């Protein structure tokens, strides 16, 4: 795998040698899982790092990121995903990409990792519950994957689906949600360069409790939009059904952009608690990514289309 510099990066955007070596652990970890194409020579290629999209805020500790999670397929408590995901098998793994496109295909996770240019991006993550983290993800832009299947003019939205494995995901035995978990984006949101398909964090492979082996990261939206353990991506003409919106449409809108001016019916969204900090901080519109994404919603009433 040739890990190339992203076209918008300069020499100053690429990490120094110590971080370059640190990021080799991702490919080494992939190789240890038996992923084809992740040899030592590939690991030496390193990863690119885009300062243009990454926040300079201090990342949340890896311990907090991997032990304080919402992943209802493994249970509803924050500690359940880490405690109950040990039996989950993220390899082998394939993802079906279909719908309104000219070249639908099924692709293995090894090909997704081996044939896409991986980047580390440090993103803020804001949960709809009023807490937040800063997470150093490793992944590739979703737009690159979608472009490979050649979307047609009928592709107005993108629908995502999580794997259904009750034997490995004990939370799916309960009717907490209408399983499998489903999410969706508008096509322009999906094609936005900020939208990431994550395969790792902190320079290592993605842990089970964080959505292994492949999850969506949309940093200007509330965290539940970041669907985990994805097995299907469909380009569709109509707005897709999404799990939390079906359960409680007044509380969880399809768009779910981070908006401190639009409260959840049961709590304020004006402030948030950063995990690892004591004091609450003000929540930023679009989670601080407004300069890149606000234009997509300029003509919309964000209180109506929440």
UniProtKB/Swiss-Prot annotation:
Residues 1-45 form the signal peptide. Predicted to be exported by the Tat system. The position of the signal peptide cleavage has not been experimentally proven. Its cofactor is Mo-molybdopterin. Mo-molybdopterin binds at residues 69, 72-73, 127, 162, 210, 215, 226-228. One of its GO terms (biological process) is protein repair. Belongs to the MsrP family. InterPro entries: MsrP (IPR022867), OxRdtase_Mopterin-bd_dom (IPR000572), OxRdtase_Mopterin-bd_sf (IPR036374), TAT_signal (IPR006311). GO terms for cellular component: periplasmic space. Part of the MsrPQ system that repairs oxidized periplasmic proteins containing methionine sulfoxide residues (Met-O), using respiratory chain electrons. Thus protects these proteins from oxidative-stress damage caused by reactive species of oxygen and chlorine generated by the host defense mechanisms. MsrPQ is essential for the maintenance of envelope integrity under bleach stress, rescuing a wide series of structurally unrelated periplasmic proteins from methionine oxidation. Coiled coil: none annotated. GO terms for molecular function: metal ion binding; molybdopterin cofactor binding; oxidoreductase activity, acting on a sulfur group of donors, quinone or similar compound as acceptor. Its EC number is 1.8.5.-. It is an enzyme of class 1 (oxidoreductase). Binds 1 Mo-molybdopterin (Mo-MPT) cofactor per subunit. Keywords: Metal-binding, Molybdenum, Oxidoreductase, Periplasm, Signal. It comes from Caulobacter vibrioides (strain ATCC 19089 / CIP 103742 / CB 15) (Caulobacter crescentus). It is found in: Periplasm. This is Protein-methionine-sulfoxide reductase catalytic subunit MsrP. Heterodimer of a catalytic subunit (MsrP) and a heme-binding subunit (MsrQ). It catalyses: L-methionyl-[protein] + a quinone + H2O = L-methionyl-(S)-S-oxide-[protein] + a quinol; L-methionyl-[protein] + a quinone + H2O = L-methionyl-(R)-S-oxide-[protein] + a quinol. The keyword Signal applies.
